[in-house]
A protein has these predicted regions:
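Active-site helix of classical SDR
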Residues: 37, 71
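Residue(s) in the substrate-gating loop at a strand-loop-helix junction
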Residues: 55
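Active-site-adjacent segment of SDR/Rossmann-fold oxidoreductases
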Residues: 43-44, 60, 81-92
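Conserved NAD(P)H cofactor-binding loop of Rossmann-fold oxidoreductase domains
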Residues: 5-10
Length: 174
């Protein structure tokens, strides 16, 4: 089993962000994950699994964390595509798209100015337990909690601009 759980984010106006940090975030969240998936395939066999850590940010464009959201959308899309490609070999691919998780990520990201509203914090153990349940069921996406499921449904129904307006209003950004 391969678990790609590393991730980082840069929060704040894109134009004001440190370019090296933006590129490092995109590199870790997207390219490093891609490399790990590819490098592990020769060692995978029927019954193997790949679990990629996405985010609830994967479902929509997220102003003031543009690169993070875009990189997590990439992870979701790649996971779904690989899942389809690797199914004939008996290799299962799942993307975990949790809400907010209490980890060191929050201290490193320095996001307090741009993330003010969080409907629920989840513990890493909760996310892992849900992911393992969903992996047993061979789900392609693991979503923990009602708030995230509700968000995913709404994002699919509402126009993109409306979704971004709601996000910015919740965070008190615009």
């Amino acid at each position: 089993m391969l678990v790609n759980a590393a991730g980082c984010g840069v929060f704040g106006p894109f134009a004001e962000a440190d370019r090296k940090k933006l590129l490092a975030s995109a590199q870790l969240n997207s390219l490093a994950l891609t490399g790990m998936c590819h490098a592990s395939l020769p060692y995978m066999h029927t019954g193997s699994s790949i679990i990629n850590m996405g985010s609830n940010s994967a479902w929509q464009p997220v102003p003031y964390q543009a690169v993070y959201g875009a990189s997590k959308s990439y992870v979701l899309s790649l996971s779904r595509a690989l899942g389809r490609e690797l199914r004939p070999q008996g290799i299962h691919v799942m993307c975990v798209c949790p809400g907010w998780i209490k980890t060191e990520f929050q201290q490193v990201a320095h996001h307090d100015e741009y993330i003010r509203y969080v409907d629920k914090w989840y513990g890493p153990d909760e996310v892992a337990a849900q992911a393992m349940q969903d992996l047993k069921k061979k789900k392609s996406v693991s979503i923990l909690g009602h708030p995230v499921r509700r968000q995913v449904r709404l994002v699919k129904l509402l126009p993109v601009d409306t979704v971004m307006d709601i996000w910015c209003k919740q965070q008190g950004i615009e």
